[in-house]
């Protein structure tokens, strides 16, 4: 939201002093609290998967263009629309309704239409699964989060998958993503920053101010850097069917903050706690967050399941297979 029209902030139903994440945090909190069975999220850097992880629900960012976007968001080229639900089956049902081409979105994907509910019936035996706790560039991951996700990754062996821990040496794409993402927000604000600055969220106004000194060449270079970085997951998916990571590097932190400030004693910047989400907004791969455990403070932890582009059905199938051996829908927050 660009303007400060909402007087209250969303809180995590598992602990009202903690954040449900964003930017679809209100959606995740509502679903987790039982206010409704499903919600739509928009994800330009993790805004489906982050709040799904923090609130202990399921969320999937589909392949870029599978669900059309109109009108375009500030994060065009990065933004995906997808379901946030208590169960994988509900997410598949939502995708059946939402996926498909739209003439108003030139990036929306054509058919053929896929029945994602039907796709849940297949198994995952024989799938080649890669697991990494850092992608090669995560600054720090909370030990409880890492341990829970590692246990969850190992459980895919029970499903008949071939699980391999990998140690990629990928460079961080944060600078390119930040340029594209923040530049889009600044451009979208446009005249409003001049005419209604007092009504604009201070954080967004600060973002717009920061980007004013950036040159057009920086923005174009970010797109080239994006294309270059896409080679890393492309090569990985030549050898593996799925990639597993923590959804984010920590559990829910204090409400009202932009980040935890530190993780396991290591100081963190504003984007250091989401190193696993925004890279795949740049590549367009489908990615889901599945609940996979809790911290000692009873805060949810999410495992991210990523697949090849256009193979959303495989991500959903893996998600429902994990859900069957590690169910979560019966777990309810204390609200």
Predicted regions and their residues:
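Short helix-loop capping/hinge segments that flank enzyme active sites or metal/cofactor-binding pockets
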Residues: 118-133, 180-234, 246, 250, ...
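A short helix-breaking turn/cap at a secondary-structure junction
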Residues: 61-147, 151-152, 170, 325-335
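Short, Asp-centered acidic motifs that coordinate Mg2+ and/or phosphate
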Residues: 37-38, 241-243
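Small-aliphatic-rich amphipathic alpha-helix that forms the alpha element of a beta-alpha
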Residues: 232-235, 265-291
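Acyltransferase
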Residues: 118, 141-167, 189-195, 219, ...
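Short, surface-exposed loop/helix-turn segments at secondary-structure junctions
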Residues: 10, 107-111, 184, 221, ...
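Short glycine/serine-rich loop segments
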Residues: 1-102, 281-302
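A short, well-structured catalytic beta-strand-centered motif of the EAL phosphodiesterase domain
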Residues: 303-309
